[in-house]
Amino acid sequence: MSDEEQSAIVCDNGSGMVKAGFSGDDALCHVFPSIVGRPKNEQAMMGSASKKLFVGDEAQAKRGVLSLKYPIEHGIVTNWDDMEKIWHHTFYNDVRVNPESHSVLLTEAPMNPKQNREKMTQIMFETFGVPAMYVGIQAVLSLYSSGRTTGIVLDAGDGVTHTVPIYEGYSLPHAIRRMDMAGRDLTEYLMKLLMESGMTFTTSAEKEIVRNVKEQLCYVALDFDEEVTNSAKTVNEEPFELPDGTIMQVGNQRFRCPEALFKPMLIGLDEAPGFHEMTFQSINKCDIDVRRDLYGNIVLSGGTTMFKNLPERLGKEISNLAPSSIKPKVVAPPERKYSVWIGGSILSSLTTFQTMWIKKSEYDEAGPSIVHNKCF
């Protein structure tokens, strides 16, 4: 039996992207959007053998004639039928294996409702017939991938941002902070900013175009007020070519959009802390003796931490909050967009981890609630 035949499958189900591949692999096999698309108009899809449903890249490619839906919102599955379609696509079309022959490691944000992971567990065993499975916390897996056992992870994806302090390999649950604002909220904010300057984006397909604008052109201002002043003095516009060939000029929206990560009130979240405040609050909830080590290992993870200048701005803002003798160190691994998956690949291939899997026999005996006993 080849290694690949018995390797576990690691599937990081993000709100925006699915990352999947074999345990122990260095390189990620498959990345595709967590989208399910259905024809807006049944008659319009004659050529596709009147297919009723498209998943991932195929849905993205046909987005002009489809209505697109993300079954995961803010890290929580809101449509289990569509989620099942995404897992089916992952196993059979992307990784191309029969899940009945492979253990599966899934990921989830901390502080999710208990029934979310119970339902994940149930579907894996009952619908896909996996022999064993495990649910890992995203930020903890990111720390594994950075080669550290102590640090605070700031993980910001498409749906959820969370800070998880970990000391000597143990996460400190009482100090975890979670905010239901992340990349998708920034995309919506950018849509609003662009519409204020006269552009119109309304459909689910056009929202995907705005997401591309965000990922390609937006950056974090090191000093927001200074950037506003400078942009008023000089023309700081970047062209973006729309699918129909029209060129759109994007100006100060480029740095106004990600500013919401530090000032959530910009998008109507008046009580929510910014990235720097979340990190600071999390560290302050930890024992005084471990705080210095956490300040020295602030590890970024997830696609929404990929903005230019974000690590530097975060370091600066945390320095303003921390005791004066502390020099915060923000670690921004270049592969951080995929570090949750990489950590899952590392963890699931360790010999010491093999006793951690939830086996089918244990599930049959205890039911879906077994996931709370065996997975942190």
Curated annotation (Swiss-Prot):
Q: Where in the cell is it found?
A: Cytoplasm, Cytoskeleton
**What does the record give as the reaction this protein catalyses?**
ATP + H2O = ADP + phosphate + H(+)
Q: What is its main location?
A: cytoplasm
Show the Pfam families listed in the entry. Answer: Actin
Q: Which InterPro entries match?
A: Actin, Actin/actin-like_CS, Actin_CS, ATPase_NBD
Q: Which GO terms describe its cellular component?
A: cytoplasm; cytoskeleton
Matching SUPFAM superfamilies, A to Z? Actin-like ATPase domain
Output the Gene Ontology terms for molecular function: ATP binding; hydrolase activity
**EC no.?**
3.6.4.-
Spell out the Gene3D superfamilies in the cross-references.
3.30.420.40, Actin, Chain A, domain 4
Its keywords, alphabetically, are:
ATP-binding, Cytoplasm, Cytoskeleton, Hydrolase, Nucleotide-binding
Q: Which family does it belong to?
A: Belongs to the actin family.
Q: What does this protein do?
A: Actins are highly conserved proteins that are involved in various types of cell motility and are ubiquitously expressed in all eukaryotic cells.
PANTHER family, alphabetized: ACTIN
Name of the protein: Actin
Q: Which organism is it from?
A: Trypanosoma cruzi
